[in-house]
Design a protein with these regions (language model features):
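C-terminal catalytic subdomain
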Residues: 114-219
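Accessory "access/gating" subregions that flank catalytic or transport cores
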Residues: 9-132
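P-loop NTPase catalytic cores that bind/hydrolyze ATP
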Residues: 5
Length: 220
């Protein structure tokens, strides 16, 4: 997503000022700090920056200017999921739990998927945000009054539709992902004669996250 964002910024001849290290220093969310640093690295040899020395253009659209904040928040969400999955993989989720050293067993709730379902839902929102902001950058680039480039990025606008359908397909995919971003973990249903009266829907959360990732990859 950062690479696509940097390429889009270059095509727009956008400002590099939003990626100044001082910006995230005063609001140091880890994902934003990492994204800002990555953008500086990706844009290090850019020739576009020179065009802004005496440029009247102060602010680019949010989808370009807020890349560290949006991409970074998504990275933080995915990091949270990663931490939860590592902890889960190294945990006992059986029922009952057997403690041989004490000669004891306990029937409890370590099998419940809520600690994973909620981070999975959080990650789906992150993936949705990546797709949303990428599609908005694409829309800007094909819009001549916004980008200064030929309509739909074709040398023969009007005669050829260029990348018009690419943006239409991306819009459809990000709209689908908004549904996948709806939390599965807020739902529950009773089973087993009301003995299992609260379930996490973690499996569904994982499946819709997988679909959201595939859709977002296509957009980016």
């Amino acid at each position: 997503a950062d690479i696509a964002g940097a390429l889009s910024l270059e095509a727009l001849m956008g400002s590099h000022s939003p990626f100044d290290a001082r910006v995230t220093k005063v609001r140091p969310h880890s994902g934003a700090v990492a994204t800002s640093a990555n953008m500086r690295k990706l844009l290090a040899k850019s020739q576009v920056k020179k065009s802004h020395v005496q440029c009247e253009r102060v602010q680019d659209p949010y989808s370009f200017r807020c890349i560290p904040q949006v991409h970074g928040a998504a990275k933080d969400a995915l990091a949270h999921l990663g931490d939860a999955l590592i902890l889960e993989a190294n945990s006992a989720t059986d029922n009952p739990l057997v403690f041989p050293d004490e000669g004891d067993s306990i029937s409890a709730g370590n099998f419940h998927g809520q600690p994973i379902a909620m981070p999975l839902d959080y990650a789906a929102n992150a993936i949705c945000a990546w797709g949303n902001i990428s599609e908005r950058r694409m829309s800007t680039l094909i819009h001549p009054s916004m980008s200064g480039l030929p309509a739909f990025l074709t040398p023969h606008p009007g005669l050829n539709s260029g990348l018009m359908i690419t943006q239409v397909v991306s819009a459809a995919l990000v709209s689908e992902n908004k549904n996948h971003a709806n939390p599965a973990s807020s739902d529950t249903i009773t089973t087993s004669a009301d003995q299992e009266d609260h379930v996490s829907m973690a499996n569904f959360a994982a499946r819709k996250l997988r679909t959201a990732v595939i859709n977002a990859q296509r957009v980016i």
